[in-house]
Amino acid sequence: MLTLGVNIDHVATIRQARQTVMEPDPIAAAVLAELAGADGITAHLREDRRHIQERDVEILRKTVRTHLNLEMAATKEMVEIALNLKPDYVTLVPERREEVTTEGGLDVAGNLNYLLGVVEQLQSRHIPVSLFIDPDVAQLKASAQTGAKFIELHTGKYANAPTADDQARELGSLAIACDIALELGLRINAGHGLTYWNVRPVAELPGMEELNIGHSIMSRAILVGMERAVREMKLAMLGLPF
């Protein structure tokens, strides 16, 4: 059954805008999201700590009752944090300090030997790894070579497509990627730029297990509250009115 992972990074972004306060608390947001039916909580601990802090992930690990997906760069520092934290799984993502948000998928094919070691290090300690990648055949094959349990398909090009034809073409690329991933024995998640109005076609892709969504839910939560925003996204994923 398709599940929803709620990304709470943007709650921390608002908090960090006023660095002397502790509000809003992403921990409270995670609790409300779970109460509303979220199947998992996602948090990205970036190297520059621009939003989520180590304090946040440490408390989340103790309080999340569904599962905790820690997004992080494949650096020595972050691997050590993950090994100590022991999240339910880790999603490895690329990072550039100048980007506003993650702009593309991980180049697994170009960094295969290094990522082989990172994946082995984490999974040998019973922390499943997901690789955030573009829907590209070479990246899919390289991801399978690492031994990672999951991939997370980057849906940004689909979400940001300027025309309906472009969006249909990007959706087709995602569908092909799903078919290849299943043939390679990879489990499939997806995320980036998904909204209440574009999520359903991605939710219907073959083998899709979890969608990780943050900005759209948090934007709506400002207007209608966290619990309603999460419930409505679950309905949108099913193609039901909300």
Curated annotation (Swiss-Prot):
<feature type="active site" description="Proton acceptor">
    <location>
        <position position="44"/>
    </location>
</feature>
<protein>
    <recommendedName>
        <fullName>Pyridoxine 5'-phosphate synthase</fullName>
        <ecNumber>2.6.99.2</ecNumber>
    </recommendedName>
</protein>
<keyword id="KW-0664">Pyridoxine biosynthesis</keyword>
<feature type="binding site">
    <location>
        <begin position="214"/>
        <end position="215"/>
    </location>
    <ligand>
        <name>3-amino-2-oxopropyl phosphate</name>
    </ligand>
</feature>
<feature type="binding site">
    <location>
        <begin position="9"/>
        <end position="10"/>
    </location>
    <ligand>
        <name>1-deoxy-D-xylulose 5-phosphate</name>
    </ligand>
</feature>
<dbReference type="InterPro" id="IPR004569">
    <property type="entry name" value="PyrdxlP_synth_PdxJ"/>
</dbReference>
<dbReference type="GO" id="GO:0008615">
    <property type="term" value="P:pyridoxine biosynthetic process"/>
</dbReference>
<dbReference type="Pfam" id="PF03740">
    <property type="entry name" value="PdxJ"/>
</dbReference>
<feature type="active site" description="Proton acceptor">
    <location>
        <position position="71"/>
    </location>
</feature>
<keyword id="KW-0963">Cytoplasm</keyword>
<dbReference type="InterPro" id="IPR013785">
    <property type="entry name" value="Aldolase_TIM"/>
</dbReference>
<feature type="binding site">
    <location>
        <position position="46"/>
    </location>
    <ligand>
        <name>1-deoxy-D-xylulose 5-phosphate</name>
    </ligand>
</feature>
<comment type="similarity">
    <text>Belongs to the PNP synthase family.</text>
</comment>
<dbReference type="InterPro" id="IPR036130">
    <property type="entry name" value="Pyridoxine-5'_phos_synth"/>
</dbReference>
<comment type="function">
    <text>Catalyzes the complicated ring closure reaction between the two acyclic compounds 1-deoxy-D-xylulose-5-phosphate (DXP) and 3-amino-2-oxopropyl phosphate (1-amino-acetone-3-phosphate or AAP) to form pyridoxine 5'-phosphate (PNP) and inorganic phosphate.</text>
</comment>
<feature type="binding site">
    <location>
        <position position="101"/>
    </location>
    <ligand>
        <name>1-deoxy-D-xylulose 5-phosphate</name>
    </ligand>
</feature>
<keyword id="KW-0808">Transferase</keyword>
<feature type="binding site">
    <location>
        <position position="7"/>
    </location>
    <ligand>
        <name>3-amino-2-oxopropyl phosphate</name>
    </ligand>
</feature>
<feature type="binding site">
    <location>
        <position position="51"/>
    </location>
    <ligand>
        <name>1-deoxy-D-xylulose 5-phosphate</name>
    </ligand>
</feature>
<feature type="binding site">
    <location>
        <position position="18"/>
    </location>
    <ligand>
        <name>3-amino-2-oxopropyl phosphate</name>
    </ligand>
</feature>
<feature type="binding site">
    <location>
        <position position="193"/>
    </location>
    <ligand>
        <name>3-amino-2-oxopropyl phosphate</name>
    </ligand>
</feature>
<comment type="subunit">
    <text>Homooctamer; tetramer of dimers.</text>
</comment>
<dbReference type="GO" id="GO:0033856">
    <property type="term" value="F:pyridoxine 5'-phosphate synthase activity"/>
</dbReference>
<comment type="pathway">
    <text>Cofactor biosynthesis; pyridoxine 5'-phosphate biosynthesis; pyridoxine 5'-phosphate from D-erythrose 4-phosphate: step 5/5.</text>
</comment>
<dbReference type="GO" id="GO:0005829">
    <property type="term" value="C:cytosol"/>
</dbReference>
<feature type="active site" description="Proton donor">
    <location>
        <position position="192"/>
    </location>
</feature>
<feature type="site" description="Transition state stabilizer">
    <location>
        <position position="152"/>
    </location>
</feature>
